[in-house]
């Protein structure tokens, strides 16, 4: 893959992946940030995936186009986002490793990647350094998906998932608190507390779930 910055505040990226005898995936992405006066900015993040079966097609016939767009407005410590995501195809948008996709509506408990699914998201993030302590931030996101049609899954996905319903819909709400250590031996250690709630109807196929997750990340410089 490759990325480029052809003009100020615009980043373009393109990648290609192959899962041998299953599918090929091409990715295009763009991010643009438009500065405004007074610590304000408007940004646009677009992601597009195109997946088709390849070789022995062990995952069956695959022909999906999936894209997402997030429009964000930042004002000082506050950031508001409105996102939309769409899957075009009879099968879910699939990938190899969880957490390895750049789609705006990929949440903590669901990726909102069902066949023919359309989803939208509202989110809010705040940097609490000015009113609490440096390194502390929080966020909340709500995503709702609908129009999921599992009635045209290929035989491989139908057997594996066991889904067959139409008019599937679901929603998820995620809360996040993050703290990044500012000084000392543990400097840059990131601690995240995440709480996700997912609710769905029977046709969507996934489970109703509440999940509390504590995550710690410490970057290490090798070179």
Q: Model-found features: residue ranges?
A:
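Residue-level signature of outer-membrane beta-barrel architecture
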Residues: 3-6, 32-34, 72-75, 84-86, ...
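Structural signature of outer-membrane beta-barrel domains
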Residues: 19-21, 49-53, 85-91, 129, ...
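Outer-membrane beta-barrel translocator/channel fold
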Residues: 39-115, 119, 202-207
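C-terminal structural cap/anchor segments
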Residues: 77-178
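Outer-membrane beta-barrel "beta-signal"
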Residues: 122, 175, 179, 208-223
């Amino acid at each position: 893959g490759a990325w480029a910055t052809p003009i100020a505040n615009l980043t373009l990226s393109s990648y290609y992946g192959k899962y041998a005898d299953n599918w090929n995936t091409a990715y295009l992405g763009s991010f643009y940030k438009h500065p405004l006066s007074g610590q304000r900015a408007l940004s646009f993040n677009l992601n597009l995936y195109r997946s088709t079966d390849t070789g022995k097609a062990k995952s069956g016939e695959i022909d999906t186009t999936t894209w997402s767009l997030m429009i964000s407005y930042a004002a000082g410590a506050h950031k508001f986002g409105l996102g939309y995501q769409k899957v075009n195809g009879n099968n879910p948008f699939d990938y190899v490793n969880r957490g390895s996709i750049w789609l705006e509506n990929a949440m903590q408990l669901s990726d909102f990647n069902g066949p023919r699914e359309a989803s939208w998201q509202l989110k809010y993030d705040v940097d609490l350094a000015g009113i609490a302590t440096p390194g502390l931030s929080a966020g909340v996101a709500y995503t709702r998906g609908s129009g999921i049609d599992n009635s045209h899954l290929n035989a491989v996905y139908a057997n594996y998932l066991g889904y067959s319903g139409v008019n599937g819909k679901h929603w998820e709400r995620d809360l996040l608190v993050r703290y990044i250590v500012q000084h000392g031996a543990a400097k840059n250690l990131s601690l995240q507390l995440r709480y996700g709630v997912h609710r769905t109807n029977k046709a969507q196929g996934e489970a109703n779930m509440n999940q509390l997750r504590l995550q710690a990340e410490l970057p290490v410089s090798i070179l």
